[in-house]
């Protein structure tokens, strides 16, 4: 391992020692000895010692019930501490080259070398748009209380990272670290109760408060410095290159716990939190802006000549307005019926105008250094977060809208909307959208399901404009799916046009996406409504579950490419919204590469992407990490727009079509067509046990009685990650590549790997998955948990995995996996020593728990801890 990582290694070692001391103090030397024996056996086993491997298995199988939980917790907590040390390494002065994105300054130099003009680069900066959508997917296993402790551990590591510390200072920091490690050890790592949608929303607000509030203005300050140095250009104060939206409290797709009332509550809570955070900012400005010299315009705004401190007076006025707004929102949250104050804050302009007036006056009076301090940071927060704090997307499944309108047409005696042809549906919807009379009768009493859909639309209509970002339609298939939502919003009295984004997420729907949008854009009423802007969401996880990762990736690429060209031809600005999971963005290179691997022109309308579960913490959990992640995104988008990747050659497209079809066939031959597959999946993974983990507010299944197709994509991936077969992330891909090689295309594949970012990223992601997969552990799960009649199926899958690894290494022309990303390879290797015992123990615990009708509480608790620990070891769960 490179010398660069020695600081991280020593931090990991130090935290491990502190954890060991804590375990010894809490449970005695014998438990620590047992943990240490297991660790040494695991290390030796990883180095290839077969005797150590067998002894490791025997030791873990023979643990007494009293030892199960302490051993599981020891390895799980160590992995959490390792992740914390690694996260600190990414921002420490000793480690920034390891995982930070390429510096923006270097990017500008490279762009100039490519003969791009400063004006081109400035235009690209002006158009920069990054919208990150925080989602409460149940992949964040770690409890919030433990996250806070780990954040403080990070702070201690930062404090220790100074060579000039006096002994007493170092001792004080070490004492605090010991306390934090002990607090973590004595805290239950598994939640007792499933979080409600409101709890999830509060978790999202905590990310804003603890990290983004400071991190976003700090990034923009750094970004501005790079622009000044490289392009002699300043980021305009009013620029909004970054926005945050949330699905927490708005995503009702398959989650009956997210009701219209919940969305209304979360919208109020979000506005309340915004007033709380802005009040802190304004209080600082009241204290700082004591200057008296100002422009005549500002003096008049502040109340005339008799006001001695005009800036301070204006800030006090804003403070009063925020206080009144907060009191009103608080009363509403308590369910009280209150009249809004006359100065209620509902729009960003109300906050922006007095602050910006102060900014302009300070600059005009020669006090630019003051204007560009705390005041500028607050102005940028108004632009990024504003009065809503985070905007909310509402997401609902397409059939819920169809059912609602069908119930209405039956009531009105117009027939059954659901059974009409697509052209009849469109004609009816467009006619009603153009009509001035309401369609929904006042005295109609619909079913509870339809009432809920209508009430959600009313919540949107009542919300201040700008607090709802978009309405996303999952499982969108036809143009009428989009028109139906516009009609429901119209009937609710929505006074503004809300972006309605169809989400295409199965293989067939991705293939049809361009046809659907072409039809929609051909409707005059629709073209007039959208005012030249269209958002389309591309589903990643569901399409991969449907067709396998390689076929899904290619369908996503083709769909995006076709949509870009269709919208360009129609003069429409397209925003592609990427519904990705945690597998993008492990380390700088994959995230950077993933953005550059999209079709040319796909980022012209900006980047809109989901940030899911535990990835929010890894990428935005600390202000410094936020700066690094935003720099990575900004650099990748500028590069993709100014130096777009090449259009794929005709031969490359033909090869992708060939291997995509072959990979889909192979994937479905197992997942859909093998009658034993579901039984094997349920036995070989902790899929059924995962349902007991109180992770998120959303049920793990769309239908409780269904097979794989009814499983949500996240538990599907999560379960296979736990047993280290990682099946959804590779099955079919290697077989498709082999088919192309058999067709004589190996040289073409090598060229694609070298010259086409889309393809090289696919290969890179496969390598990372293969590095995390483990054949002997997957086999051990089979031996402990699976009926012997199903062993041949498990063996077939492992043989396929081994063959796929060889194929990918041959195409990448590498001797070993992750050769070009040694930092991530090293990180995985470091974790394996601690994750392997958790995997073995998990298989043992699953075996014990499945033998008993009512498993011992200690077995169940230890099992949940191993699931959390393996998730920490793998660094991406779903």
Swiss-Prot record:
A GO term for molecular function: magnesium ion binding
Catalytic reaction(s) noted: oxaloacetate + phosphate = phosphoenolpyruvate + hydrogencarbonate
One Gene Ontology cellular component annotation held by this UniProt entry? cytosol
Superkingdom field: Bacteria
- What biological function has been recorded for the protein in this entry? Forms oxaloacetate, a four-carbon dicarboxylic acid source for the tricarboxylic acid cycle.
EC class, as a word, reads lyase
Recorded family membership: Belongs to the PEPCase type 1 family.
**Cofactor(s) the record lists:** Mg(2+)
What is one process in the GO biological process aspect for this record?
carbon fixation
The record's Pfam families line, in alphabetical order, gives:
PEPcase (PF00311)
What organism does this protein naturally occur in? Yersinia pestis
Listed name of the protein? Phosphoenolpyruvate carboxylase
This enzyme's EC code(s): 4.1.1.31
**Which UniProt keywords are given for this protein, alphabetically ordered?**
Carbon dioxide fixation, Lyase, Magnesium
């Amino acid at each position: 391992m490179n010398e660069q990582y020695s600081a991280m290694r020593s931090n990991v070692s130090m935290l491990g020692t502190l954890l060991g001391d804590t375990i010894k103090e809490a449970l005695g030397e014998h438990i620590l000895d047992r943990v240490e024996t297991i660790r040494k056996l695991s290390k030796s086993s990883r180095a290839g010692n077969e005797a150590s491997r067998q002894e490791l298995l025997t030791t873990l199988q023979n643990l007494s019930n009293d030892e199960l939980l302490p051993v599981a917790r020891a390895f799980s907590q160590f992995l959490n501490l390792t992740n914390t040390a690694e996260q600190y390494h990414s921002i420490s002065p000793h480690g920034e080259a390891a995982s930070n994105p390429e510096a923006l300054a270097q990017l500008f130099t490279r762009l100039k070398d490519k003969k791009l003009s400063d004006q081109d680069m400035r235009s690209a900066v002006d158009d920069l748009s990054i919208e990150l959508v925080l989602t409460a997917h149940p992949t964040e296993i770690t409890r919030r209380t433990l996250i806070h402790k780990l954040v403080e551990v990070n702070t201690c590591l930062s404090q220790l990272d100074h060579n000039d510390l006096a002994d007493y200072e170092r001792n004080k920091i070490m004492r605090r670290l010991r306390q934090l490690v002990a607090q973590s050890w004595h805290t239950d790592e598994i939640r007792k109760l499933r979080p409600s949608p409101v709890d999830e929303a509060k978790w999202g607000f905590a990310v804003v408060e603890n990290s983004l509030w400071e991190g976003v203005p700090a990034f923009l300050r750094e970004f501005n410095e790079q622009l000044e140095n490289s392009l002699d250009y300043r980021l305009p104060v009013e620029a909004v290159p970054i926005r945050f939206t949330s699905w927490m409290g708005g995503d009702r797709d398959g989650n009956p716990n997210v009701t219209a009332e919940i969305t209304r509550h979360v919208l109020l809570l979000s506005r309340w939190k915004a007033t709380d955070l802005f009040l802190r900012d304004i209080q600082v400005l009241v204290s700082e802006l004591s200057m008296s010299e100002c422009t005549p315009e500002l003096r008049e705004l502040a109340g005339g000549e008799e006001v001695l401190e005009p800036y301070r007076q204006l800030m006090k006025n804003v403070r009063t307005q925020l206080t009144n707004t907060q009191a009103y929102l608080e009363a509403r949250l308590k369910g009280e019926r209150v009249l809004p104050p006359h100065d209620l804050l509902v729009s960003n302009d109300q906050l922006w105008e007095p602050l910006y007036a102060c900014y302009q006056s300070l600059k005009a009076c020669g006090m630019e250094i003051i204007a560009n301090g705390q005041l500028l940071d607050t102005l940028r927060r108004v632009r990024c977060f504003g009065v809503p704090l985070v905007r909310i997307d509402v997401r609902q499944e397409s059939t819920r809208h169809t059912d609602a309108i069908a119930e209405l047409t039956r009531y009105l005696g117009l027939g059954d909307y659901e059974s009409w042809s697509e052209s009849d549906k469109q004609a009816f919807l467009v006619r009603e959208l153009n009509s001035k009379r309401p369609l929904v009768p006042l005295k109609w009493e619909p079913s509870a399901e339809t009432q809920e859909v209508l009430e959600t639309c009313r919540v949107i209509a009542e919300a201040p404009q700008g607090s709802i970002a978009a309405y996303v339609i999952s499982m969108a298939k036809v143009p009428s799916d989009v028109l139906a939502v516009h009609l429901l919003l119209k009937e609710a009295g929505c006074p503004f046009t809300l972006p309605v984004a169809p989400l295409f997420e199965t293989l067939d729907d991705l293939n049809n996406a361009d046809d659907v949008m072409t039809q929609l854009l051909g409707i005059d009423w629709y073209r007039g409504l959208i005012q030249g802007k269209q958002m389309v969401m591309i589903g990643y996880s569901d399409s991969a579950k449907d067709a396998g990762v390689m076929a899904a990736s290619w369908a996503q690429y083709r769909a995006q490419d076709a949509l870009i060209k269709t919208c360009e031809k129609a003069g429409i600005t397209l925003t592609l919204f990427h519904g990705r999971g945690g597998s993008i963005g492990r380390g700088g290179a994959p995230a950077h590469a993933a953005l550059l691997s999209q079709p040319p022109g796909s980022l012209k309308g900006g980047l809109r992407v989901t940030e899911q579960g535990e990835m929010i913490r890894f990428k935005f959990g600390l202000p410094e990490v936020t700066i690094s992640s935003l720099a990575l995104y900004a650099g990748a988008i500028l590069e993709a727009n100014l130096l777009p990747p090449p259009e794929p050659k005709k031969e490359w497209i033909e090869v992708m079509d060939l291997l995509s079809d072959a990979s889909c066939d192979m994937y479905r031959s197992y997942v859909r067509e093998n009658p034993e597959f579901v039984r094997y999946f349920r036995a070989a993974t902790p899929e059924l046990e995962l349902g007991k983990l109180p992770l998120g507010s959303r049920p793990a299944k769309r239908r409780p009685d269904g097979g794989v197709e009814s499983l949500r994509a996240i538990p599907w991936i999560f379960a296979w990650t736990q047993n280290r077969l990682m099946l959804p992330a590779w099955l079919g891909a290697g077989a498709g590549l082999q088919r192309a090689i058999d067709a004589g295309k190996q040289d073409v594949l090598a060229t694609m790997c070298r010259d086409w970012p889309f393809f090289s990223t696919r290969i890179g992601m496969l390598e990372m998955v293969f590095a995390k997969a483990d054949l002997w552990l997957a086999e051990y799960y089979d031996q402990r948990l699976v009926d012997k009649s199903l062993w041949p199926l498990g063996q077939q899958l492992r043989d396929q995995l081994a063959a796929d690894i060889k194929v990918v290494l041959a195409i990448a022309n590498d001797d070993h996996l992750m050769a070009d990303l040694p930092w991530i390879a090293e990180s995985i290797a470091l974790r394996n020593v601690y994750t392997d015992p958790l995997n073995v123990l998990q298989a043992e615990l699953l075996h014990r728990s499945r033998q008993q009708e009512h498993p011992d509480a200690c077995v169940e608790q230890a099992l949940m801890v191993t699931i959390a620990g393996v998730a920490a070891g793998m660094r991406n769960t779903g």
